[in-house]
Amino acid sequence: MANSTGLQFTVKVGALPDTTFAVVDFELSEALNQPFALSLNLASSQPGIDFGAVLDQPCELLVWYEGELQRRVSGIVSRFAQGDTGFRRTRYQAEVRPALWRLGLRTNARIFQTQKPDAIISTLLEEAGITDYAFALRHDHAVREYCVQYRESDLAFINRLAAEEGLFYFHEFEAGKHRVVFADDAGALAKGPELFFNLATQGLSEGAYVRRFRYAEAVSTAEVALKDYSFKTPAYGLLHNKMSSELAHQRESYQHFDYPGRFKQDPSGKAFTGYRLDALRAGAMTGNGESNAAELRPGSSFTLTEHPNPAFNLAWQVVAVAHSGQQPQALEEESGGEPTTLSNSFEVVKATTTWRAALPYKPMVDGPQIATVVGPAGEEIYCDEFGRVKLQFPWDRYGASDDQSSCWVRVSQGWAGGQYGLIAIPRIGHEVVVSFLEGDPDQPIVTGRTFHATNPSPYPLPASKTRTSLRTSTHKGAGFNELRFEDQAGQEEVFIHAQKDMNTVVLNNRSTSVNASHTENVGGDQTVVVQHNQTVSVKENQVTEIQGEQTVAVTKNRHTTVDDNESLQVKKNIAIQSQSGDVLIATAGGFIAIDKDGNISITGKGLVLNGTRIDLN
């Protein structure tokens, strides 16, 4: 193929012979944190190429100069189209994307727990069959206790997670394959070539060069302040600030404040604040230009030389580049002898600047959701020291409905103070209503409970609609405790059921008023201890029935007053004994007295002794 410039473009597609396609022209768009897009216009002598041999198959574009390889780009064919057929050739068009692009076709909702961001990204890549990836990380990234991919593509989730963690990614190419590399610092980027500045329009005979270069500065955010809250340290202000060090040409008063900052600990807050500042200032100092250097790609740098402004003759990091190549010789009947050309336009920042992506949209949960309380096998109640529980969401296909299904989730209670309030721990199997703080799927909180077909209400409805009940269930048993209110007119009732013990503590007075009858039934023993006085007042009759023995112990005096008659009937013996004093039995007209020495005195109007036998000594 005749070519006066020494340039040549070739392409390999799947298992097809290398000569199947000729490259007519191509457009290659590359940028940090984006899957590249390669558009190929092709020509072939075959008018009916099998789409199955091309679509979703590997494809590699090679750029040659004087027989030496200058650049390669490999990926998979995401779109393939057949165009017009000429005298000897048929036109085709192919769109080539990296394997990472496939993750944009996979939408999911899932939970990652206690994993670092690079481990989460690795899982997603490997599930998509991508094993050629690398991490060039220079900073520590904390373990994420709970990280949710919520109704978003795997690619969108990776982009979001990478942006939150200050990561950026780019592609590197080797023979027949490409690698996605994740980095967090400009120091990890590969150093590229020196490119001299050349205003003239020349070929590659003198080497690759930059023919246009422009530099701009823009007033941008000067400072970032991020704040968050942790219930574990409620009084501590999780606030972090970061001021840019490159504010010579603008004011320092442009502060970006945001809440929540999406962190719960100081190390993460400090790092996230710096990442946010870098992202907001990504456009503060930028350059752009045009060149004929095929090797320019994101993830690398080049050093500009021979520019009239010496301030520009330094190392620049490529943020984005758009390559364009034309090879009209591929269409021999239409070429008109035009040469093969390659050019590009690029966007750069200083090589010492770490470029970071702006935070993309994070999916929000539009409203409350239903979940089921879960825990380890054999348990009925499972919580931590804060009363938090584990949940299984209906949309989580990976959870096993056990103690690993979610993070510990806080539970809203009706009243919560310092060691006082109302607490009721949702139990395993209960259905709960879950809300999300700020709509963030990473921050669930239980705000309600609901019955369902498997867990019905304590009483059948609507038959018992007038009842308000607080009924518990014995842990690993069949009993219950209950406080119930019946509000049916004429049947109003307050009912208390204690499955075992009932303890009442009153630190001051207690009053009980019963307008009708009061019945108490004690199945075992009863003990009443009164520290001071006790008064029992019965306005009518009192009946005391003791089927066993009765013992009355009085430490001091005992007084019994009967306004009418008193009758004492004993079927066997009666014993009256005064151990150290006198005994006196008296009426209005006389008495019988026995003193402590045993002397008996009888006083009265008369004395009658009747008996079969009377002995007097």
Swiss-Prot record:
Region (Disordered): 449-469
Cysteines paired by S-S bonds: none
Disruption phenotype: A double vgrGA-vgrGB deletion inhibits the ability of RhsB to inhibit cell growth. VgrGB alone restores RhsB-mediated cell growth.
Superkingdom of this protein's organism: Bacteria
Alphabetical list of Pfam families matching this protein: Gp5_trimer_C, Phage_base_V, Phage_GPD
Family to which this protein belongs: Belongs to the VgrG protein family.
Its job: A Vgr protein that is probably part of a type VI secretion system (T6SS). May be required for export of proteins involved in Rhs-mediated cellular contact-dependent growth inhibition (CDI).
NCBIfam families: vgr_GE, VI_Rhs_Vgr
UniProt protein name: Putative type VI secretion system protein VgrGB
